[in-house]
Amino acid sequence: MIPVIRSFLSLLLCVGLTFGLGGCVTTSLPMAAASPWNSQKLGIESNPLDVAFTNESHGFLVGSNRLVMETSDGGETWEEREIDLPADENFRLISIDFNGDEGWIAGQPGLLLHSDDAGQSWSRLLLDTKLPGDPYLITALGSKKAELATNVGAIYQSSDAGKSWQAEVVDAAGSVRDLRRGDDGRYVSVSSLGNFFSTWDPGQSNWQVHQRVSSQRLQSMGYQPDGQMWMVTRGAQLRFNPEGGDYEEWSKPVIPITNGYGYLDMAWDPQGNIWAGGGNGTLLVSSDGGKEWEKDPVGTATPSNFTRFVFLGGNKAFALGERGAILRWVG
């Protein structure tokens, strides 16, 4: 009798968990018939972290272990580039951006590079030793103008090619694990432990702190194409922000698949499809706003953790993996 009771209780627990998570939980998904991605292997051990282009054909990829690669054919092929940096420092080049021929690279520890000739040469900018944190995200805003955010949420702007910087916030947000900038200049950051997130709108003097919406720790957050927000939490859960101005209002969790691997990033492609990437070749796509999902065949066949999507406008996009693995958007 006792085994029967235990089985019944286990069934009730499973049903309760399924409904408590607010959606259908599955351990398998159908495979998409085709993929808009092309797999590339760069032949390196470093992790690619960001991509930016000066025009339709010419661009750069940066990453860990001082990685700099250049393309002149829209990203079909890449060649390693050497930048004059101290040999005894193993820089992590984490962010790159261009405005025409003017480019910026942010790296750790304490590195900021500037170019005014489409990346043919780079000069190192001196950063104040009192700068809170390390450079994390650089955004080119116009001629000689850029915005720099650090890994503790300090935000600065320069309008003289990086010679001087003006603080945008009075106090930093604290150590972050993820930080994103919206097209309208808003920022969202996830705390290093994932137990809360912070938002900053242009004109505010301080970051606004918000508690996480469930017991699941936050992994990453960002902005949807319409300016509303998305959230990835531990436990392979996705959430959406239905009211862009209300940072406390979130959808029930969406759990596309429970395969033991979490998600690391989300993005929207030019057709409005949602992509979610994560561990061990996890690359999923939804064409109906997150209700139904499919596995991408190219991503599934790529033995890598997909850490970030970079959609650059038009039909140019990349899914960045680890140890030189990237996917290029071919539509």
Curated annotation (Swiss-Prot):
GO biological process, one term: photosynthesis
Lipid-conjugated positions (S-diacylglycerol cysteine): C24
Keywords on record: Lipoprotein, Membrane, Palmitate, Photosynthesis, Photosystem II, Signal, Thylakoid
Signal peptide: 1-23
Lipidation (N-palmitoyl cysteine): C24
Subcellular location: Cellular thylakoid membrane
SUPFAM superfamilies: Oligoxyloglucan reducing end-specific cellobiohydrolase (SSF110296)
Keyword check for ATP-binding: no
HAMAP family named among the record's database cross-references: Ycf48
Function: A factor required for optimal assembly of photosystem II (PSII), acting in the early stages of PSII assembly. Also plays a role in replacement of photodamaged D1 (psbA). Assists YidC in synthesis of chlorophyll-binding proteins.
Binding partners and assembly: Part of early PSII assembly complexes which includes D1 (psbA) and PsbI; not found in mature PSII. Binds to the lumenal side of PSII complexes. Interacts with YidC.
UniProt domain comment: A 7-bladed beta-propeller torus, about 55 by 55 Angstroms, with a depth of about 25 Angstroms and a central pore.
Annotated NCBIfam families: PRK13684.1 (NF010237)
Entry-linked PANTHER family: PHOTOSYSTEM II STABILITY/ASSEMBLY FACTOR HCF136, CHLOROPLASTIC, PHOTOSYSTEM II STABILITY_ASSEMBLY FACTOR HCF136, CHLOROPLASTIC
Listed name of the protein: Photosystem II assembly lipoprotein Ycf48
Organism name: Synechococcus sp. (strain RCC307)
Classification of source organism: Bacteria, Bacillati, Cyanobacteriota, Cyanophyceae, Synechococcales
Gene that this sequence comes from: ycf48
